[in-house]
Each structure stands twice: as C-alpha cells, then as structure tokens.
Amino acid sequence: MIENLLSKFSYDMWVALTILAGLLAWAFAKGRKDPRSKKAPTSREQRGTTQRPSGESPHEETDSSPKKKPRAIQKGSADEFTSAKRDIVASRETSDPFRPRIKGPHSDLSSSVEAQLLAPGMVYALAYGDFLNSFGLSNSRGITKMLKRDWDITDRSTLLRQIYSMLRDGHRSYYNDLRKKALDLAASQTRVNPGFPKSHWRELSRFINDERGLQTTNFTAWDLMRAANLTRAGEGLGWMTRDEAEDTLALINHGLRTTYSSWEEACDAFIVTRWLWLNEEGEAMEASDLHDQRRREALVGPNGVWNKIPWDGTYPSPRYLLLDASDENFQLNPMSRFEWEDAPRWERELDDESHKRIQERNER
C-alpha cells in the first residue's frame, strides 16, 4: 500500500512539474513577443543619438550626451568646447517655422528703437515664434526649462553672470586661440598623433584649410547674439528689469556695429561660427546648413527683417547697468594687459567701465 502511494505521488509530481514547465515556457515566449514587455526607450533613444536642427528642436543638444552646460564661461576650459556645446533653441509654429512674426506694420521697423535693440536676438526669436520687434516670450515655461537644462540658469544671478561672461570673452576667445594654434601647427608641419581625437582634429583642419573663411572670420557675433537672446529671455521671465535689458541690448548693438559693417556680415559670421561650434560632418552638417540657410533668408534675404532695420540706426548709448548689478550677482573680471592690446574698442570700453566700478567699491 505504501509503495502504491509513493508511486501515485511520484506520478502526480511528475505531471505537476511538466505542466509548470510548459507554463513557464509559454510565458517566456509570450514575453519576448509582447511589445509591451520591452523596456521603455530612454529619452536619448527616442530622440536619436544625435539631435539635428532640421527646424531646431526643443531639445537640440547637438553633440552632447551627458548633461554638461556652458556655465559662466571659463577661458580655455576643454570640456566646455568639446562636450558642453549648447545652442539655445525652441519649438516654433509648425506651419512655417521661419516666418517672422512682426507686431504692427513692417514699415515701422526702420524707425522703431525697440526693434533696433532687439535685432541681435532675432536669430533666436525667429526660432521661438516670438514677435521679433517686441519684448515678451511666447513660451515662458519652455524657455525656463531650456535655461536650466542648457545653461544652468535658474535665477537672476546665474543669468547675469552668464551674459557678462559672453560679453567679457565668450567662445570667441577660445576660437581665436584655436585658430592661432592650428595655423602654427600647419606652419611647423607638425605630425598629428594617431590617437588625437577626431573631433579636435576636424576643428583644427578646418582652420588650416580655411574652410568657409575661418582664417579671417570674426567670431564676435556668435557671443553677442546669444547674449542678446539670454537678455530677452531674462526680461521676459522677470529676472532683469526692462531698463537693464534695453541697456544691455544697447551694449550688444554697440559691439556688433563697431565690429561689422552690415547685418549681412554679422549674420554670416554668426552662421559660420555656429557651424564651427557644431563640429559636424556628413548628413548632420547638411541638415544644419539647410537650417541656417533658411534662417539667413528670413533675416537678410530679399525680404529679410534685418534689411528693414537700418544698420546705422539710432539706439541709446549703453550705461553698463549690467556691471552695476555685479556687486550682488557676479564678480567683474578685468582684462590683462595682453588682452587689452588686442581687444576691440567696445571691449576696451566695457573694461574701462568695469575698472570704474571696482574702484568705486574699493573707495566705499
């Protein structure tokens, strides 16, 4: 009897184990076929490994994989210019993303002081879908997120610090140094180490081969137009007063007009520097080129907005209110003697005003 029970128990166990094994195999096979069981893609997988500005996406991080941003710019910082590149971009009207939005008659642009002041930031206001000739933001929430994500700007202090940093030396200082190194490298016929990063070599070779006129490009427009965009954003978010924003834009206009001879020249300098900064090749570069070609058409083409704004138009003289705010928000960084010798007029004037404020504070 005991033997019969053991035999029946063994048989029942064998049947149960067989059924269990079958169920496990079925569940495993179903899990592999069921798309709902797949791991949800990361945001990077959803966007693709590299974002390209076919129309400038809301999250265009271009070459960045980790979240590294151009904080208050530190001159010569390697990671800032290799993995911390940021172009401030935003979504726009999907029907025609390059259709300028103008408040009031277009004929008023030629005499509008506000349009004159806002003009340098129009390269980005065009992308945001904002009115080009009027203060204000069409997507304050999106701008706030972008500033935090791409610039580490979260308040008045971090905003003013970054604007001052771009006015002080920005990326142009780095690119001027890189150009000199590239040309020295070519002149000495130095052999490049095989392990030298491809992206670095691409930058150097573009200078050496004078691609797109890099050997004579003035990179100032890249810094000033981005600073204008941050200024407009700061005013729209309440981190700068209207008076501070207008005065900072007056300084930016002064810098552009004492550096270039026309809107077209300034626009081309911005686009070439942006191309250098993106450091792309192949299809990605072609997509970016198409984007900037359309941007250029909207600004300086036959019906471009900048053509309606006189290059030699009147705008207020800068009072350097940004520097007045430095006491509570950031530290002034005067030029060295060597920097002064090579600096353009508008940068020397900015430096003079910085020294005045430093002296006043020391005398308190």
Regions found by a protein language model. Name each.
Residues M1-F9:
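Short, strongly hydrophobic alpha-helical membrane anchors
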Residues Y11-T18, G22-N229, A233-E235, W239-R242, ...:
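Polar/charged low-complexity regulatory segments
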